[in-house]
Swiss-Prot record:
ATP binds at residues 12-15, 55, 59, 166, 169. Allosterically activated by GTP. Inhibited by UTP. Residues 20-25 are annotated as: Involved in allosteric activation by GTP. HAMAP family: PyrH_B. It is found in: Cytoplasm. Its EC number is 2.7.4.22. InterPro entries: AceGlu_kinase-like_sf, Asp/Glu/Uridylate_kinase, Glu/AcGlu_kinase, Uridylate_kinase, Uridylate_kinase_bac. PANTHER family: URIDYLATE KINASE (PTHR42833), URIDYLATE KINASE PUMPKIN, CHLOROPLASTIC (PTHR42833:SF4). One of its GO terms (cellular component) is cytoplasm. Catalyzes the reversible phosphorylation of UMP to UDP. UMP binds at residues 54, 72, 133-140. This is Uridylate kinase. The keyword Mitochondrion does not apply.
Length: 236
């Protein structure tokens, strides 16, 4: 059996990834594929926390003329919808899963309580953190960094639509250069689109490495936790 490099991981999945090729809403084939990949690493004994974005349902910046705070709260609720969808896919595969929300909705999910989240992880349950940080003006990238620090995750697995970090958008520019390794400071100084600056700074302050990889290739999550060379690694 291959050695496991990371025992406890924080998986960040963008809302757009859940939408698949539709670009909007939830593609349950994609949700089931992601759930299958999560199950693979849970079966290895890895403890998994997850944060799902909400961009497939609502983006705060789309609310033109809308109060920013209201738009952000709508985005937080969108992440809850995605979290419940992913929970359903995981539980259909017999993976014990809990959703914890930063905004209380007790009939739907548990409130975020750090000690309870840690206990779930220790028992082998997947914990999906929804509702952002519970505060407007903070992205789900920042949520992932914050929760990763709180649960003492070994790494953040940043699953995206591209297979790593580039100096410019590889979908638009054929000459885009991919980075294999970056430091936190390089990401901040070059303004590379890994995570937003708040999230990157939080990871830097708590020395949490970030692995950026493409979600469209099956088996990438497993490869990442086993320490195989994949995507881009951001660290000290």
């Amino acid at each position: 059996m291959q050695s496991i490099k990371y025992k406890r991981v924080m998986l960040k999945i963008s809302g757009e990834a859940l939408a698949g090729t539709n670009g909007y809403g939830i593609d349950f084939e994609v949700a089931n594929r992601i759930a299958k990949e999560i199950k693979e690493i849970v079966d290895l004994g890895i403890e998994v926390g997850a944060v799902v974005g909400g961009g497939n349902i609502w983006r705060g910046r789309n609310g033109k003329g809308m109060d920013r705070t209201t738009a952000d709260y709508m985005g937080m609720l969108a992440t809850c919808i995605n979290a419940l969808a992913l929970q359903d896919s995981l539980e259909n595969m017999d993976v014990d899963t809990r959703v914890q929300t930063a905004i209380e909705m007790k009939q739907v999910a548990e409130p975020f309580i750090r000690r309870r989240a840690m206990r779930h992880l220790e028992k082998g349950r997947v914990v999906i953190f929804a509702g952002g940080t519970g505060n407007p003006y903070f992205s789900t990238d920042t949520t992932a960094a914050l929760r990763a620090a709180e649960i003492e995750a070994d790494v953040i697995l940043l699953a995206k639509k591209v297979d790593g970090v580039y100096d410019k958008d590889p979908h638009k520019y054929d000459d885009a250069i991919k980075f294999d390794n970056l430091t936190y400071m390089e990401v901040l100084e070059k303004n590379l689109q890994v995570m937003d600056s708040t999230a990157t700074s939080l990871c830097m302050d708590n020395n949490i490495p970030i692995i950026v990889f493409g979600l469209d290739v099956s088996g990438n999550i497993r490869k990442a936790v086993l320490g195989e060379k994949i995507g881009t690694i951001v660290s000290k």
